[in-house]
Amino acid sequence: MKNFLFLVTLYCEVLCMLASCGKDDDNPVPEPEINRFVLFGKTYPAFTVFVSKEVLGKGNYDIYVYPAEDNTIELGLQCSMQHDGMSLDLTKYDPLNAVPGYSGWMWYISVEKTEEGKEEYLLEGWGGDAPTMGILGVAGDILYIKSLNKDHTQFEIRCKLTDPEKRSLVFYYKGNVTLATE
């Protein structure tokens, strides 16, 4: 009888240990990113991403995003191909400013609204080092552009920008893009 009680107690202890340790996950698997375009708190679930083929030939990325539900809005993301795969801190001037003699593209982000032939900049950021021209973001703002293949038809793009007026953009995309001719 003592052996039976001992085995039942041991069995219960093992079950309790398994139940308490079963879901203690110190290294959870991160949720996969989903494609999203959020401008000033409004989510645009469907959008199209274009990359300028002509500008690729000059060593730069010129990317345009158009929400399906609002054809008046255009998101523009630009930077040198030298930034490919780099996470740029948008609170700082473009690191290529420090390269002697560099005259290529700096990072640039814009959101434009075009109605009745009139363009209005809703949000803008630029990594130039001229005090009157640099429009930097706030802590945590980044631009990350990575071409995922040699022919530049697949990209991973991440952008978060908040301007001095606290207007914000959050954009993430990983997938195929359309190569556009100007």
Where are these regions (language model features)?
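Sec-dependent bacterial lipoprotein signal peptides
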Residues: 1-20
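Bacterial Sec-dependent N-terminal signal peptides
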Residues: 16-45, 181
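N-terminal helix-cap/turn-to-beta initiation motif at the start of protein domains
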Residues: 26-32, 143-152
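Tryptophan-anchored aromatic micro-motifs
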Residues: 32-53, 57-59, 124-127
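A mature extracytoplasmic/lumenal domain signature
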Residues: 43, 79-81, 92-94, 149, ...
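Short, hydrophobic/aromatic-rich segments at coil-to-beta transitions
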Residues: 58-62, 151-157
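Edge beta-strand at a domain terminus
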Residues: 141, 156-182
